Amino acid sequence: MKKPLNFAILKHVTTVNEACADDVIEALKGEYGTSKWLNKKSVLEALFTGQTNGFLKETRYEMVDGDLKIYFEAPPDGKEKINKYIPD
């Protein structure tokens, strides 16, 4: 059974050093590509919610061709919480 998309977004960030919304969309489009929620606005909302809840941390941001990219990581305590509450 497939995880809810918000869970998959958090789990993905635990598997990489850092990720922006575009990275997450690219990584999850194989499994969630038909979901209307796999878009930049919804993914950013999930990433910011993860940050607000203490699971993720913003690492950096940059402008690429007029597009703001905000990168997040799951620090060790965040990874631990995510992996505890969202099993593989």
Report the location of each language-model feature:
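Short alpha-helical segments that sit at the start of domains
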Residues: 1-18
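Short, positively charged loop/turn segments that connect secondary-structure elements
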Residues: 29-44
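Short, Lys/Arg-rich nucleic-acid/phosphate-binding segment
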Residues: 60-70
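Short acidic, hydrophobic short linear motifs in intrinsically disordered regions
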Residues: 19-29
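A short, conserved structural fragment
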Residues: 51-62
